[in-house]
């Protein structure tokens, strides 16, 4: 399974692609951070993010997209930018018919480090170890995007298959009526 992990943000949007499956070694395909200038109007920044996500999906052909689930923080402007970038990423993936997994920060931290309250350094160190990298991905947005992809492969992939089976069973029951 190939997963594109997206750590959404209006200023820095981390994107990382990981190949692998449960019980098998995972492999880094690519990682980067898309940046937009705070000097630009928000709509232009969102278009930049949209084009960046589209380009990554086109280039890497992921089987699924994992996006950090937005949660409330005290800084409303940060939450708004994160939510806007997240929405753009979801629309781009949905337009292509890609399954989308939303994972909370604590779920991602727990998946890669065993501790839902792990710090950025610990998450980065574990991503480096899991993907057998020589150096830690930087900035933290890059490591977070890879952690999202890893989490989706380890957890979300199985959940997506369960959800698909339940949906298929429901449709089968409805068609018999």
Swiss-Prot record:
<feature type="binding site">
    <location>
        <position position="7"/>
    </location>
    <ligand>
        <name>Mg(2+) 1</name>
    </ligand>
</feature>
<comment type="similarity">
    <text>Belongs to the RuvC family.</text>
</comment>
<feature type="active site">
    <location>
        <position position="141"/>
    </location>
</feature>
<dbReference type="GO" id="GO:0003677">
    <property type="term" value="F:DNA binding"/>
</dbReference>
<keyword id="KW-0234">DNA repair</keyword>
<keyword id="KW-0963">Cytoplasm</keyword>
<keyword id="KW-0378">Hydrolase</keyword>
<dbReference type="GO" id="GO:0006310">
    <property type="term" value="P:DNA recombination"/>
</dbReference>
<comment type="function">
    <text>The RuvA-RuvB-RuvC complex processes Holliday junction (HJ) DNA during genetic recombination and DNA repair. Endonuclease that resolves HJ intermediates. Cleaves cruciform DNA by making single-stranded nicks across the HJ at symmetrical positions within the homologous arms, yielding a 5'-phosphate and a 3'-hydroxyl group; requires a central core of homology in the junction. The consensus cleavage sequence is 5'-(A/T)TT(C/G)-3'. Cleavage occurs on the 3'-side of the TT dinucleotide at the point of strand exchange.</text>
</comment>
<dbReference type="GO" id="GO:0008821">
    <property type="term" value="F:crossover junction DNA endonuclease activity"/>
</dbReference>
<keyword id="KW-0233">DNA recombination</keyword>
<dbReference type="GO" id="GO:0048476">
    <property type="term" value="C:Holliday junction resolvase complex"/>
</dbReference>
<keyword id="KW-0460">Magnesium</keyword>
<keyword id="KW-0238">DNA-binding</keyword>
<dbReference type="InterPro" id="IPR036397">
    <property type="entry name" value="RNaseH_sf"/>
</dbReference>
<dbReference type="GO" id="GO:0005737">
    <property type="term" value="C:cytoplasm"/>
</dbReference>
<feature type="binding site">
    <location>
        <position position="141"/>
    </location>
    <ligand>
        <name>Mg(2+) 1</name>
    </ligand>
</feature>
<feature type="binding site">
    <location>
        <position position="68"/>
    </location>
    <ligand>
        <name>Mg(2+) 2</name>
    </ligand>
</feature>
<dbReference type="GO" id="GO:0000287">
    <property type="term" value="F:magnesium ion binding"/>
</dbReference>
<dbReference type="InterPro" id="IPR020563">
    <property type="entry name" value="X-over_junc_endoDNase_Mg_BS"/>
</dbReference>
<protein>
    <recommendedName>
        <fullName>Crossover junction endodeoxyribonuclease RuvC</fullName>
        <ecNumber>3.1.21.10</ecNumber>
    </recommendedName>
</protein>
<feature type="active site">
    <location>
        <position position="7"/>
    </location>
</feature>
<dbReference type="InterPro" id="IPR002176">
    <property type="entry name" value="X-over_junc_endoDNase_RuvC"/>
</dbReference>
<comment type="subunit">
    <text>Homodimer which binds Holliday junction (HJ) DNA. The HJ becomes 2-fold symmetrical on binding to RuvC with unstacked arms; it has a different conformation from HJ DNA in complex with RuvA. In the full resolvosome a probable DNA-RuvA(4)-RuvB(12)-RuvC(2) complex forms which resolves the HJ.</text>
</comment>
<dbReference type="Pfam" id="PF02075">
    <property type="entry name" value="RuvC"/>
</dbReference>
<keyword id="KW-0540">Nuclease</keyword>
<keyword id="KW-0255">Endonuclease</keyword>
<dbReference type="GO" id="GO:0006281">
    <property type="term" value="P:DNA repair"/>
</dbReference>
<feature type="active site">
    <location>
        <position position="68"/>
    </location>
</feature>
<keyword id="KW-0479">Metal-binding</keyword>
<dbReference type="InterPro" id="IPR012337">
    <property type="entry name" value="RNaseH-like_sf"/>
</dbReference>
<keyword id="KW-0227">DNA damage</keyword>
């Amino acid at each position: 399974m190939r997963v594109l992990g997206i750590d959404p943000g209006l200023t820095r949007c981390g994107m990382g692609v990981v190949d692998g499956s449960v019980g098998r070694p995972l492999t880094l395909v690519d990682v980067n951070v898309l940046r937009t200038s705070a000097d630009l109007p928000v709509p232009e920044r969102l278009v930049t993010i949209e084009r960046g996500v589209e380009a990554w999906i086109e280039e890497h052909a992921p089987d699924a997209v994992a996006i950090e689930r937005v949660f409330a923080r005290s800084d409303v402007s940060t939450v708004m930018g994160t939510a806007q970038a997240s929405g753009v990423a979801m629309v781009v993936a949905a337009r292509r018919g890609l399954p989308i997994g939303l994972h909370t920060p604590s779920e991602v931290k727990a998946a890669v480090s065993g501790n839902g309250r792990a710090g950025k350094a610990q998450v980065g160190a574990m991503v480096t170890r899991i993907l057998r990298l020589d150096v830690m991905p930087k900035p933290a947005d890059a490591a977070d995007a890879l952690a999202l992809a890893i989490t989706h492969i380890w957890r979300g992939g199985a959940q997506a298959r369960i959800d698909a089976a339940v949906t298929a069973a429901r449709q089968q029951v409805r068609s018999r009526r």
